[in-house]
Amino acid sequence: MDMWKFFDITHREHILCNPMSLEKLDQLITLLRLKHGARVLEIATGKGEFIIRLAERYRQMTGTGIDFSPYCIAEVRKKHQTRVPDAQLSFLEMDGAEYLPETLESFDLAACIGASWIYGGHRGTLNALYRMATPESWIVVGEPYWRHEPEGEYLEAIGVTRSDFGTHYQNVEVGREHGLEAVYTLVSSQDDWDKYEGLQWYAAETWASDHQNDPDVETVLKRVRENKTAYLRWGRETLGW
């Protein structure tokens, strides 16, 4: 089935499409202290809660949000018009990896939160954002990390390899390779993770009940239930973010 349809179904109850609380997001936004007229780029903007909240707090910023999902782009454009209609924001439906700004090193904040697969991993993401950000800018990323060594069965179940993610410390060290220094980190709590995962189960089951004739019902339920088993059996104790 269409991957964006699947993502839209399983995240229809989410405000944030990652395992982070709104309180932590607001804390981050407060710490950024964007200057007047700051230029912001968010790759994989999702439902756009981060960039919309930035615009609500920093009214004089301009922002560009990129996402490949037509569902997400439609939702974030609606948020823009209802919550910050006067904000200078634009949203592009495209592959983030193909986005190139008119001028490199032009953004005061460059972000890709929870979608490093776009650039082939954490290192590739930092490299891409680094090239688009000004020397004194903020770079914001969200990346999984191993809390302890993952079991082989878990890796097979979720379709990743051990080398796809590092430890929390290793994620920071990759930044240092680019001359970046981590000044703050937000780590998802068990409650953050349980809410993120649990809302997917709820969304899938309620959607399936309401759309019993949809040809993708079986696919959605099978995938979500398999992911639920992997999370409860291994992921809850193994994967951080």
Region locations from a protein language model:
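A short acidic, Gly/Pro-enriched loop at the edge of an enzyme's catalytic core
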Residues: 101-110
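A short SAM/SAH-binding and catalytic strip from SAM-dependent methyltransferases
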Residues: 109-121
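A short glycine-rich, Lys/Arg-flanked "PGG" loop and its adjoining helix->strand segment in the class I
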Residues: 123-138
